[in-house]
Amino acid sequence: FTNLQKRKFVIYFHNDPLTMSGSVTIKERLFILNFCDKIIFNSEWTRKRFLTNLEKFYQNSEKIQVICQSTTKVKVDLMKKDKIIIFVGKLNKSKGYDIFGKAVIKILKEFKDWKALIVGDEPREKIDFIHKRFIKLGYRSNLDVLNLFKKSSIAVACSRWDEPFGRSSLEASSRGCAVIISNKGGLPETITDGVILNRLNSSNLFNEIKKLIINKKLRQTIQSKSINNFYLDDKYISSKIDIYRNDLFDKKAF
């Protein structure tokens, strides 16, 4: 126990603390607060979930810090964007793939010069959509995904479940996509500009995609703002990590 007292303990929450063994109850979370030197969350949403029903005394603890995921920041020529709607993620109902498919098949029937790219797989669920411009690419490397985002005009992340953060929408925003997301969990924290679906269904998604296709000025405005206002890049997050490390070893926090 003496050796343990000399060490610094940090816990990182990448998912909803209230659904993870060891942090469900108030007692468990108070133990974590008292035992750990730092508690890192990947979004404001996961932080708030951890603090649910805890006394105000703990709300502003210096032990608690949000450090989001990040990606590279690059120059994107919006004039080179293709008429592509892209979906990246597990092809299951939790990710809203069925909602996306129903909406986009209707879009492709109405707008003959647009196509959809689908990146991902899901061996546990079989949700299939067939259209010659509904192109399933399967699993791709992260570099490939970033390049696909770079040439896509519209990206959709329409999860049903409360995403703790949401990497695909973050990366789509960084590459200048007009991003449509569901208002679930930490997804709204992944974009600075875009469309947030407060009512998630295929009809609403269809309408928002159609609006972006028809209104080119609106689409390009969102794309431009996504690029210009994007700040969750590797450099920024690395600086936050440096501050956290210095704080961890320079002083005791509570």
Question: Where on the chain are the PLM-derived regions?
Answer:
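Conserved acidic donor-binding segment of nucleotide-sugar-dependent glycosyltransferases
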Residues: 194-203, 211-217
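A short, active-site helix/loop in glycosyltransferases that binds the activated sugar's phosphate group
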Residues: 29, 34-61
